[in-house]
């Protein structure tokens, strides 16, 4: 989905959910952005046991050991690069070392990234929120849930602001 639509926020809700926390032995969040850096990602997955070396094969071995036999959740947030060669180098040890039931959740704006990842589950495409949802969220954030529905002035101002935000939650969060 487009920027500001709520991909990262939704992924954070999943990542921080108590059932998700108890289901996975290891959870890792990596803000990827651009460029797609396999060494940075592998070191993030390795956590405290990350090597100081920047030699890719060695870093990938350390990453493999850190997840060996563990059910993990890896969130790769804001992936732009769709270079399948780089992804395959990182993906292979993740699949080989992690326990059955491990998951990789990816947020991206680009359909090419989804194709490159060869996802085994469906992509969830987020769209703009309806006017009603936007108004509800905006009022919650702007007025801390005080009763604003009875005030026509507040309602008109809220609607004018939301028209400019075009259904993007990040726009009215700012």
Show where each model-derived region lies.
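Short, conserved phosphate/pyrophosphate- and ester-handling motifs at nucleotide-, phospho-/glycolipid
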Residues: 7-8, 77, 107, 168
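Post-nucleotide-binding-loop coupling segment downstream of the phosphate-binding loop, primarily
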Residues: 5, 9-61, 65, 81
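P-loop (Walker A) phosphate-binding loop of NTP-binding proteins
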Residues: 2
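Alpha-helical elements of the RecA-like P-loop NTPase motor core of helicases
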Residues: 22, 39-40, 88, 115, ...
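A conserved switch/coupling segment of P-loop NTPase cores
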Residues: 16-23, 58-129
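Short alpha-helical
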Residues: 5, 36, 82-85, 112, ...
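Non-catalytic, charged helical/coil tracts that couple and regulate nucleotide-powered enzyme cores
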Residues: 45-54, 99-102, 106-174
């Amino acid at each position: 989905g487009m920027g500001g639509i709520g991909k990262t926020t939704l992924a954070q809700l999943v990542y921080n959910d108590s059932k998700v926390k108890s289901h996975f032995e290891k959870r890792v969040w990596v803000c990827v952005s651009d460029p797609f850096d396999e060494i940075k990602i592998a070191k993030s997955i390795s956590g405290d046991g990350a090597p100081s070396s920047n030699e890719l094969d060695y870093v990938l071995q350390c990453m493999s050991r850190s997840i060996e036999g563990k059910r993990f959740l890896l969130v790769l947030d804001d992936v732009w690069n769709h270079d399948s060669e780089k992804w395959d180098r990182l993906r292979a040890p993740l699949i080989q070392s992690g326990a059955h039931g491990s998951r990789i959740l990816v947020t991206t704006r680009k359909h090419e990234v989804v194709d490159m990842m060869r996802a085994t589950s469906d992509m969830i495409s987020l769209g703009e929120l309806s006017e009603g949802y936007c108004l509800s969220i905006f009022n919650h954030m702007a007025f801390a849930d005080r009763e604003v529905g009875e005030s026509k002035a507040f309602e008109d101002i809220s609607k004018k602001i939301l028209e400019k935000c075009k259904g993007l939650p990040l726009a009215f969060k700012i």
